[in-house]
Design a protein with these regions (language model features):
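Active-site-proximal loop/hinge segments that shape catalytic or ion-binding/gating pockets
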Residues: 1-62, 70-204
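Short, conserved catalytic/metal-binding motifs centered on acidic residues
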Residues: 66
C-alpha cells in the first residue's frame, strides 16, 4: 500500500498545510473557513452513523484507500478538475489510536465499520480491486463502486507532517500550485496526473 488519499478543493490547501486535515465536526465547531466539495445531504448522513467508540463519522477525517472512485468523479464534474487535488497521506496514520476502517463508503447503510486489525483483514479480500488501474469492471456495479470507496477513519485530524504529496489534474495546475507552495516554504511533492500519476486519467 503506497498510502491513503484525501480529496479536497485546492483552495483548502493553505489551511491544510498549516493545521492538517480536520474532521468535519472540528471544521464546524471551530468555524474553519473551508471550501466544501461534497453534497450536503451526504455529509449529513455521516452525522447519523457511529463507530464502536460511540462517535459519529463527523468525528473522523476520512481517507480513501483508492482515490480513483466515483466520489472523485462526482466532485470533478461539479467543481472542475482544475480545482481539485488528491493528497497522498502516509500509511503510518493507520497506527493512530482510535482508527477505524470501513469496507466501503462509510455513509452507505450496507457498509460495515471495523477496528483497524479487522478492517485490514477484510480489505485483503478487496485488495486486487482496490489496487486495480481498470475502471471497466466496477463502472456498472453498485457493490464495487461502494467498495472502491473503502475508508480509513482517523480521529479528529491528520497532521501536516503525514502529507506526502499533492496530485493534480495536469502540468498547468501543478506549476501554479508549486509556486504557491514554494512561497510558503512548504516542501511537498506536486505531481501532475498527466506525467506522474494516473489518478485523474479517466476524467480527461
Amino acid at each position: 500500500m503506497k498510502g491513503l488519499y484525501y480529496i479536497t478543493h485546492i483552495g483548502n490547501l493553505p489551511s491544510i498545510l498549516e493545521k492538517g486535515i480536520f474532521s468535519h465536526g472540528r471544521i464546524r465547531s471551530e468555524s474553519i473557513q473551508n471550501t466544501t466539495i461534497y453534497l450536503e445531504h451526504l455529509v449529513n448522513k455521516r452525522g447519523n452513523k457511529y463507530t464502536a467508540d460511540g462517535e459519529n463519522l463527523w468525528h473522523y477525517a476520512n481517507l480513501f484507500f483508492q482515490p480513483r472512485n466515483s466520489m472523485l468523479l462526482s466532485v470533478i464534474r461539479s467543481k472542475g478538475k482544475q480545482n481539485i487535488t488528491v493528497l497522498r497521506i502516509s500509511n503510518t496514520v493507520l497506527q493512530r489510536q482510535g482508527v477505524f476502517i470501513t469496507d466501503g463508503i462509510a455513509s452507505n447503510k450496507l457498509t460495515r465499520i471495523y477496528s483497524r486489525s479487522e478492517g485490514l483483514e477484510v480489505l485483503q479480500a478487496q485488495q486486487e480491486m482496490l489496487q486495480s488501474d481498470s475502471w471497466t469492471s466496477w463502472n456498472h456495479s453498485d457493490k464495487i463502486r461502494r467498495q472502491l470507496m473503502a475508508e480509513c477513519l482517523v480521529p479528529n485530524q491528520v497532521d501536516p507532517k503525514d502529507i506526502q504529496r499533492f496530485i493534480v489534474a495536469d502540468r498547468s495546475v501543478a506549476s501554479s500550485l508549486w509556486v504557491r507552495l514554494s512561497s510558503s516554504n512548504i516542501q511537498k511533492l506536486v505531481v501532475a496526473s498527466d506525467i506522474g500519476s494516473n489518478i485523474f486519467t479517466p476524467f480527461k
